[in-house]
UniProtKB/Swiss-Prot annotation:
UniProt keyword ATP-binding, yes or no: yes
EC number: 6.1.1.19
Gene expressing this chain: argS
Compartment list: Cytoplasm
Name by which UniProt lists this protein: Arginine--tRNA ligase
Subunit composition and interactions: Monomer.
'HIGH' region (motif): residue ranges: 126-136
Catalytic activity: tRNA(Arg) + L-arginine + ATP = L-arginyl-tRNA(Arg) + AMP + diphosphate
Broad class of where this protein is predominantly found: cytoplasm
A Gene Ontology BP annotation from the UniProt entry: arginyl-tRNA aminoacylation
Catalytic EC class: ligase
C-alpha cells in the first residue's frame, strides 16, 4: 500500500508539471510514512511543503492541487489535508482485506520483490587457531539474519567468511608445534584439541624467547613462500579451527558453510599486485620506511593526514592490503552490486579509508556499493565489555551452554510434568533463541547490556514472549481442525480486526528497511508489535465463539496469517519456532 500511495503521488506531481504549476525539471523524493495516529489516516506525506518554493504557492493550496490530480484508486477511501499542508491517506478496508488474502496465499506474504541484486555479505570472520568468543556473536548472527532477509527478498547472496587464517599467529603455532613434535613425535597433534591452550602456550614462548620469536617470523615467511611442510601444518590448524567454528554455527542455526570461507590467505598472491598498482598510479608515499597512501579527506585531530598503511617497512602486508584485494575480487570476479561488511563500529575509519581508496584507484566498479554495517559492543551488567568473573574473555560455547542450562530450568518450572526429552528440546530452542534475539532486537549501532534474566523473561520484547505468542496462535488451529476455510475470506469490521490487519500489512515495509539498512531490530520490533496487536484482537474478538460463521472463518484467517507472519519473521532472524511450550 505504501508503494501504491507513492505511485499515486508521483502521477499527481507529473500532472502538475504538465500544467506548468511545478517546473518540469523539479526533482522531488516522494516520502510517504505510516501515521502514528489512525485518526490521521494510514499514510501521510509532506510533498506539498516540499513544492512550496518551486510552485510559488502556500502548502495547503498545493496539497489541494495534488489531491485534485490524484488518479482514481480503489485502495484509497479518502484523502485529507492536515495542519500546514500534510496530505493524509485513508486506506479502504476492503482493499486492505484483499491485500491480506493475497499475503495469506503467497510464499512471500504478498511482498512486491525488488529487482534482484548480487550482494556479498562479509560476516562472522573470526581469527583462526583460537576459539570463538562472545565478541564474534554480533557479526555472526546480525550478518546471518540480513543474509536470510536478502534471500527472502529475491537477491542472490554470496556469503564471505573472511577468516583470519594468515599472519604472525601461525608462525607462533608452527614454531611451537615443531618443539612439541621434536619432544613427543606425531602424538603432539593431539594437543590441538584444545586450541586456546595451544595458542596461549605458543604466545608465552613468543613473548619470552627472542630465539623462538625469530623462528616464528621465519616460519611465516616460509609459509607465505609455499613451503610444503609449513603449509601442511597450517592446513591442520585451519581444519581443526574451522571445525570448531562450524560446530558453533550449527548450534546457533547460522547458515555459513565451509564453502563460504574465503580467508585472508586467499588473497596472499594478489597483495604484491595491489602495491604495484597503487604505485603505478602515483598514489603511494613513503613514511618511516612503510608504503602508505594519504587521502585529503582523512586527518587526525591536529589536522595532519592519516595514512592507509599498505606495506610495512619489513615488507609485511596489513589488513588494508588484503581488504583492497578482497574488494577487487568481489567487484570484478563476483560482480556484486553491493558488499556489506558486518564488522565492529571501531573499524569505521578503516573502512571509510579503504572504500574511498578502492574507488580512487579504480580497483572496483564505480556503481558498486560498499557498506560498513558497524555494530556496538556486548557488555556485562556493569556496562563494560562482557567478561568472565576472573576478567577473561567469555568463550561463545560457554555462553551457549549457560543459556541452555538456564532455559531448561525455566521451561521445567513452567512444565514440571513434561517428558525430559521434550523439555530438553524446548530448552535448546528457547536458549539459543533468547541469546540471539537479545542481540538482534537492539539497534546494531548501539552497545547493549547482556542479561540472562532479561533475555529469558516471558514479558517484554524477548524471544520467550514471541515463541509463546506463536504457540498461542498456532494452538487456535488445533481446536479448529474441522472448520472448512476453503471458501472463507477476510472481513475487517471490528476496530481490533482493522488494527491487526494494518499491522500485518506493514511486513513488506519492515523487510525493505531490514535489507536496505541491515537492521534486524526493525523486524524484531515489528514482530513484538504484531504479537501485541494479535493479543488485543484475541481479547476483543472471539474467534471460535464468534457470533457468525462468516466472522469465525474471517478471524481464523487473520489468525492464520498472523501465525504465518510470526513464523516467517522469526525464521528470518534465524530462530526456530515451537508448537508447544
Amino acid at each position: 500500500m505504501k508503494s501504491h500511495t507513492q505511485s499515486l503521488l508521483a502521477e499527481s506531481l507529473n500532472a502538475l508539471k504538465q500544467q506548468g504549476i511545478v517546473p518540469a525539471d523539479f526533482e522531488a523524493r516522494i516520502q510517504v510514512d505510516r501515521t502514528k495516529d489512525k485518526s490521521h489516516g494510514d499514510f501521510a506525506t509532506n510533498l506539498a511543503m516540499m513544492l512550496t518554493k518551486a510552485a510559488g504557492k502556500n502548502p495547503r493550496e498545493i496539497a489541494q492541487l495534488l489531491i485534485d490530480n490524484l488518479p482514481e484508486s480503489a485502495h484509497v477511501e479518502k484523502v485529507e489535508i492536515a495542519g500546514p499542508g500534510f496530505i493524509n491517506f485513508f486506506i479502504d478496508d476492503n482493499a486492505l482485506a484483499n491485500q491480506l488474502m493475497v499475503a495469506l496465499n503467497s510464499d512471500h506474504l504478498g511482498l512486491e520483490l525488488p529487482t534482484p541484486q548480487t550482494v556479498v555479505v562479509d560476516y562472522s570472520s573470526p581469527n583462526l587457531a583460537k576459539e570463538m568468543h562472545v565478541g564474534h556473536l554480533r557479526s555472526t548472527i546480525i550478518g546471518d539474519s540480513v543474509v536470510r532477509a536478502l534471500e527472502f527478498m529475491g537477491h542472490k547472496v554470496i556469503r564471505q567468511n573472511h577468516v583470519g587464517d594468515w599472519g604472525t599467529q601461525f608462525g607462533m603455532l608452527l614454531a611451537y608445534m615443531e618443539e612439541l613434535r621434536a619432544a613427543n613425535g606425531e602424538q603432539a597433534k593431539m594437543e590441538l584439541s584444545d586450541l586456546e591452550n595451544f595458542y596461549r602456550a605458543a604466545k608465552v614462548r613468543f613473548d619470552e624467547s627472542a630465539e623462538f620469536a625469530t623462528r616464528a617470523r621465519k616460519l611465516v615467511v616460509e609459509l607465505q613462500s609455499g613451503d610444503e611442510y609449513c603449509n601442511k601444518l597450517w592446513r591442520e590448524f585451519n581444519d581443526i579451527s574451522l571445525s570448531h567454528c562450524h560446530e558453533l554455527y550449527e548450534r546457533l542455526g547460522v547458515s555459513l558453510t565451509r564453502a563460504d570461507v574465503r580467508g585472508e590467505s586467499a588473497y596472499n598472491s594478489d597483495l604484491a599486485q595491489v602495491v604495484a598498482d597503487l604505485d603505478a598510479q602515483g598514489l603511494l608515499s613513503e613514511s618511516n620506511g612503510a608504503k602508505v597512501v594519504f587521502q585529503d579527506e582523512f586527518k587526525n585531530k591536529e589536522g595532519e593526514p592519516l595514512p592507509v598503511i599498505i606495506q610495512k617497512a619489513d615488507g609485511g602486508y596489513l589488513y588494508a592490503t588484503s581488504d583492497l584485494a578482497a574488494m577487487r575480487y568481489r567487484s570484478n570476479v563476483l560482480n556484486a552490486d553491493r558488499a556489506l561488511y558486518f564488522v565492529d563500529l571501531r573499524q569505521a575509519l578503516h573502512f571509510q579509508q579503504v572504500f574511498k581508496l578502492a574507488k580512487t584507484a579504480k580497483f572496483v566498479r564505480e556503481e558498486m556499493s560498499f557498506e560498513h554495517m558497524g555494530f556496538g559492543t556486548m557488555n556485562g551488567e556493569d556496562g563494560r565489555p562482557f567478561k568472565t568473573r576472573s576478567g577473561g574473555v567469555v568463550k561463545l560455547i560457554d555462553l551457549l551452554k549457560e543459556a541452555d542450562t538456564r532455559a531448561l530450568d525455566l521451561v521445567r518450572s513452567k512444565n514440571p510434568d513434561m517428558d525430559e526429552a521434550e523439555l530438553a528440546e524446548i530448552a535448546r530452542v528457547v536458549g539459543i533463541a533468547s541469546v540471539k534475539y537479545a542481540d538482534l532486537s537492539k539497534n546494531r549501532a548501539s552497545d547493549y547490556i547482556f542479561s540472562f534474566e532479561q533475555m529469558l523473561s516471558f514479558e517484554g520484547n524477548t524471544a520467550p514472549y514471541l515463541l509463546y505468542a506463536y504457540t498461542r496462535v498456532a494452538g487456535i488451529f488445533k481446536r479448529a481442525q474441522d472448520v472448512d476455510l476453503s471458501d472463507a475470506t477476510i472481513i475487517l469490521e471490528h476496530e481490533k480486526e482493522k488494527d491487526l490487519g494494518t499491522k500485518l500489512a506493514q511486513f513488506g515495509e519492515v523487510m525493505t528497511r531490514m535489507v536496505g539498512k541491515g537492521q534486524p531490530h526493525a523486524l524484531c520490533g515489528y514482530l513484538f508489535e504484531l504479537a501485541g496487536a494479535f493479543s488485543s484482537f484475541y481479547e476483543a474478538c472471539p474467534v471460535l465463539a464468534a457470533e457468525t460463521e462468516e466472522s469465525k472463518k474471517s478471524r481464523l484467517l487473520l489468525s492464520q496469517l498472523t501465525a504465518k507472519t510470526l513464523k516467517q519473521g522469526l525464521n528470518l532472524l534465524g530462530l526456530e519456532t515451537l508448537e508447544r511450550m
